Amino acid sequence: MTKVITRFAPSPTGMLHVGNIRVALLNWLYAKKHNGKFILRFDDTDLERSKQKYKNDIERDLKFLNINWDQTFNQLSRVSRYHEIKNLLINKKRLYACYETKEELELKRKLQLSKGLPPIYDRASLNLTEKQIQKYIEQGRKPHYRFFLSYEPISWFDMIKGEIKYDGKTLSDPIVIRADGSMTYMLCSVIDDIDYDITHIIRGEDHVSNTAIQIQMFEALNKIPPVFAHLSLIINKEEKISKRVGGFEIAYLKKEVGLEAMTIASFFSLLGSSLHIFPYKSIEKLVAQFEISSFSKSPTIYQQYDLERLNHKLLISLDFNEVKERLKEIDADYIDENFWLSVRPNLQKLSDIKDWWDICYQTPKIKNLNLDKEYLKQASKLLPLKITKDSWSIWTKEITNITGRKGKELFLPLRLALTGRESGPEIAGILPLIDREEIIRRLISIA
């Protein structure tokens, strides 16, 4: 049986966003599910926009999500191989030189669209005479190269979308080599997939037409194409997610929103599938439940709120031993198990625990100055002598007996005086963490 080999091929022209991290996760999970191999490839043929900084950022984000690769390479290191295949395809008459300028091509495109025609290249360069070609060369024009597509029907079975068919006549011969000699994504990707024995490619449905073209490239090189799966796109406010839409970068979700790695991994591994989105504690458990057949053909809606809610669910499921290392990472290794268990139910992000530590062990900032001072003074006198886990219940019952207060009128002034916040962890759990004298001091300082 052929070993499964998948790949993730980002362009280092920006930071990873939720759309392409989803592609990375699913390719990695598919490989691991089948005891296969996962390759990280950098499609850096865009010399102007590709940056080493973005390569470093991509690797950092993948490592953060526990996506480890078995092999990595970048396309710029393989230029000689691409030119070898270029010459082979020219000899096979599947690549041909074109001499139109960008302006001429744009004019052709506009004319076709104005007539209600699809913007398909007319193959005019195939009819150039030697004299015309020589004239272009003398003008200083350098050729770009297109792949010659067969007009035969193209079809394949997609692991998500099922049978897909294309009429070759509806596709335009793609430019595979620019006039400056640099290579575009289309052919380079096919050559890499052949040389690295890629067996399965999982990517967004915006690549479906590319797949139709690339299948012909595989066939032109006498190779069997990989198995394809095209994911429905992630939609947010009617927009497709891309690196040009701000706020969706993994670095942003990690640093600004405060999401845990397994929150992001769990969410985007299951988003768009029929499986329940559950906050898994380890990437290995995600591998065990992963099924590519569970993914839907329909567009997938992503909302940041759903991620934040899942992050909360993950945090409240973690035992202290499971979170100790993460506490060290955020410089909160002073947190002990008792404190963790007390505040855990109300954490939206892990760093919130530092705020609650400050609430318990530093004087809170009281924003509401309209508290009933006499009530707080009276409450301070009713505080039990020994503070235990039952003290809050005993204390508030006694306050009710003496003052007649109930509900919000009873609880909110006490919470504000003790924590400076209108909501948060159960005071029953927080109270034993604060020294009795400090509790009285906070009540009296307002009263």
Curated annotation (Swiss-Prot):
Aminoacyl-tRNA synthetase recorded as keyword: yes
Catalytic activity: tRNA(Glu) + L-glutamate + ATP = L-glutamyl-tRNA(Glu) + AMP + diphosphate
Motif ('KMSKS' region): 240-244
Motif ('HIGH' region): 10-20
GO molecular-function term, one example from the UniProt record: glutamate-tRNA ligase activity
BP-aspect Gene Ontology terms: glutamyl-tRNA aminoacylation
Record has Electron transport as a keyword: no
Principal place of residence: cytoplasm
Intracellular or extracellular location(s): Cytoplasm
InterPro entries: aa-tRNA-synth_I_cd-bd, aa-tRNA-synth_I_codon-bd_sub2, aa-tRNA-synth_I_CS, aa_tRNA-synth_I_cd-bd_sf, Glu-tRNA-ligase_bac/mito, Glu/Gln-tRNA-synth, Glu/Gln-tRNA-synth_Ib_cat-dom, GluQ/Sye
EC numbers: 6.1.1.17
Binding positions (ATP): 243
A cellular component term, taken from the record's GO annotations: cytoplasm
UniProt keyword terms in alphabetical order: Aminoacyl-tRNA synthetase, ATP-binding, Cytoplasm, Ligase, Nucleotide-binding, Protein biosynthesis
Principal EC category: ligase
Function in brief: Catalyzes the attachment of glutamate to tRNA(Glu) in a two-step reaction: glutamate is first activated by ATP to form Glu-AMP and then transferred to the acceptor end of tRNA(Glu).
Family statement: Belongs to the class-I aminoacyl-tRNA synthetase family. Glutamate--tRNA ligase type 1 subfamily.
NCBIfam families, per the entry: gltX_bact
Subunit and interaction comment: Monomer.
Protein name as it appears in the record: Glutamate--tRNA ligase 1
Organism from which the protein derives: Rickettsia prowazekii (strain Madrid E)
